[in-house]
Amino acid sequence: MILSITIPGVPVAKGRPKFTARGGFARAYTPAKTQRYEDVIRCEAVAAMAGRDPVDEAVTVSVTAYVVPPKSMPKKRRLEAIEGSVKPLTRPDLDNYAKAALDACNAIVFRDDSLVTDLLIRKRYSEHPRLTITVEAGEDYA
C-alpha cells in the first residue's frame, strides 16, 4: 500500500468550474469550497507521504465518501442505512468525490492522475462523515 488517508468531516464533491469575464476575457476558476477541501486533502496526503516522492507507476485508487443519512429518514430506515443495506442515492454525484480526491493527490501521491489505472468509488451512509482514500501499486493484468 502506498497511502491510506481519512479526511474527517462532510465530504465535498468537486464543484463545476465557475466563469467570470474581465476586460473582455473569460476566466474559469474552481469554486472556493472545492479549493479549500482539496487543500485539506493535499495536507493529509503530504503528511502521509512523509517526504516520499510521488509514485511514477500504475496505481489503483479507492475513494469512499461516507455521508450522514438525512434527518427526515425514518428511524428504522436510518438504522438500515448505517448498517449498509440502504445506499445513498442523493446528490452530489459519486464521480465528483473522486475528481476532488484525484486532483488533490496529483503530483503529491502520484506524478500524474493519468497513472491511475483502476478506480473504485463508493458512497455510503455513516454517523461519522468522512472521505477515505487508498492508493496501492497497480495490478499487472498482462
Question: Which residues are covered by each model-predicted region?
Answer:
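Acidic, proline/glycine-enriched N-terminal capping motif
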Residues: 1-142
